[in-house]
């Protein structure tokens, strides 16, 4: 929440990411958008284009790594559910799936950390999300199912994006978050 920081000159922009052009921001923060675009790489290029020289960019996307179960089971459901009326999707599709996910995550969170459990699908993510209540799980599952497009991105794709000549190579970072997503960024030249 930026209102709780000393920064006084900030703006939240909501626009078509791929076509939006600005004079450049000190920070462009793009979370959960790129992986839903028809062309995620074009979206990333737009992020970079909207950072002023010396400014920073930070992005977060779904990883291909660590999401095998989601890709195998949830993606086929999403392709159908995303075409349904949102209330049907939210309450008749997402809610039952969220209930299963809720209990699975809570079970993994209660398990004593052990090498065997760490091999369960989405172990790290489940231990993180298990701290939340059911409504958060429901929101996450619905968010996963409502979008018409999702692309799970490999680390190598992110590495290639960060080779953009407009980004200082010494400033880049890629971190796996919760075993199933990438957070990454750098400083514009």
Per-segment meaning from a language model:
Residues 56-99, 117:
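Conserved class I S-adenosyl-L-methionine
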């Amino acid at each position: 929440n930026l209102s709780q920081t000393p920064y006084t000159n900030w703006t939240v922009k909501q626009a078509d990411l791929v076509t939006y052009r600005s004079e450049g921001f000190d920070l462009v923060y793009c979370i959960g958008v790129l992986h839903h675009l028809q062309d995620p790489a074009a979206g990333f290029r737009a992020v970079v284009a909207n950072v002023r020289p010396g400014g920073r960019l930070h992005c977060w996307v779904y990883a291909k790594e660590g999401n095998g179960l989601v890709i195998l089971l949830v993606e086929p459901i999403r392709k159908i559910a995303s075409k349904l009326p949102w209330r049907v999707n939210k309450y008749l599709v997402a809610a039952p799936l969220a209930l299963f996910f809720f209990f699975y995550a809570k079970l993994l969170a209660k398990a004593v950390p052990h090498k065997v459990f760490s091999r369960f699908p989405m172990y790290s993510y489940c231990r993180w999300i298990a701290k939340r209540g059911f409504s958060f799980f429901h929101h996450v599952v619905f968010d996963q199912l409502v979008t018409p497009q999702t692309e799970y991105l490999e680390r190598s794709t992110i590495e290639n994006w960060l080779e953009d000549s407009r980004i200082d190579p010494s400033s880049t970072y890629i971190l796996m978050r919760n075993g199933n997503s990438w957070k990454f960024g750098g400083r514009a030249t």
